[in-house]
């Protein structure tokens, strides 16, 4: 017989289901993800640090978990919520079940609940604090705890690498500032021949410039960009000296460094089916996204940044470029794994930018 578990929200509502994953019951910000596949990549995405993910697709875990598709070594989310968790997955690459991996990494979950109802609540009221309990009589106490608890402010500190390391390539050298990077960013750069040095988020502009890279990339990561104050002088110190590409949190920090401001979204963008329009080409890409903050478009008017991409669902800023310097960014994930791959060309654009900049520097110094 399956053990009961309850998902409790800070507004006092609760949902009865059954135990999935660990008994290490946690609290966190509850969000929803609309992707139909890629649950392994989702639960191992560091951008979900401290959050509880509600999967809107009704069946999760049906192709198991394998060792190759993780986006980080250790998942850092605080829980998952599913309608149905497959107990008997089937795939030739499968090595563990979803339940096994959640238990291994001390991540609790709940299955057998109405995920549509939970998603509607989040859409109507915004993201909420939530937690798990296995005892119905503890629900009232948990509600009080959720209403009072302060969630961590700087999740980047949890997931950023503590020491630099290198993923070897043969051509251009890239410094990747790790705010909670997904492994597929490194893969996409390596595939294009880039030698990637991953550095902590506290690395200074002087330390980066001393490495003499051909380009700098700011990774994705969790939480509020305004908390990551140390990144602002770093970005300002490298801008114009070497080509620059920011993704997700890196995009937001790029904008903040130039005088723009950010805001917390009601329920964010999380999924693999978000349409984004490229304003320069008119093309629409289907993108993978995972962010709860966005850049205020009006705050860009007094900056040297130009909007290059917009979300078609709500009109929020999805891409920027500097008007005169070799620097650009996108709010979404061009490295999306398992997909979509509509925006992979942005890595090619970055490589071309580095190559052209290097050639110009060579002519200037000749």
Swiss-Prot record:
Catalytic activity: hydrogencarbonate + L-glutamine + 2 ATP + H2O = carbamoyl phosphate + L-glutamate + 2 ADP + phosphate + 2 H(+)
One function term, GO molecular function aspect: glutaminase activity
Disulphide connectivity of cysteines: none
SMART domains (alphabetical): CPSase_sm_chain
Chain segments carrying region CPSase: 1-171
Pathway: Amino-acid biosynthesis; L-arginine biosynthesis; carbamoyl phosphate from bicarbonate: step 1/1; Pyrimidine metabolism; UMP biosynthesis via de novo pathway; (S)-dihydroorotate from bicarbonate: step 1/3
Keyword Nuclease set for record: no
Name of the top EC class for this enzyme: ligase
Record-annotated Glutamine amidotransferase type-1 domain positions: 173-360
Keywords linked to the UniProt accession: Amino-acid biosynthesis, Arginine biosynthesis, ATP-binding, Glutamine amidotransferase, Ligase, Nucleotide-binding, Pyrimidine biosynthesis
Entry binding sites for L-glutamine: 47, 221, 223, 249, 252, 290, 292-293
InterPro entries from the UniProt entry: Anth_synth/Amidotransfase (IPR050472), CarbamoylP_synth_ssu (IPR006274), CarbamoylP_synth_ssu_N (IPR002474), CarbP_synth_ssu_N_sf (IPR036480), Class_I_gatase-like (IPR029062), CPSase_GATase1 (IPR035686), GATASE (IPR017926)
Catalytic site: 248, 333, 335
Subunit structure: Composed of two chains; the small (or glutamine) chain promotes the hydrolysis of glutamine to ammonia, which is used by the large (or ammonia) chain to synthesize carbamoyl phosphate. Tetramer of heterodimers (alpha,beta)4.
Family classification: Belongs to the CarA family.
NCBIfam families (UniProt xref): CPSaseIIsmall (TIGR01368), PRK12838.1 (NF009475)
Function: Small subunit of the glutamine-dependent carbamoyl phosphate synthetase (CPSase). CPSase catalyzes the formation of carbamoyl phosphate from the ammonia moiety of glutamine, carbonate, and phosphate donated by ATP, constituting the first step of 2 biosynthetic pathways, one leading to arginine and/or urea and the other to pyrimidine nucleotides. The small subunit (glutamine amidotransferase) binds and cleaves glutamine to supply the large subunit with the substrate ammonia.
Protein name: Carbamoyl phosphate synthase small chain
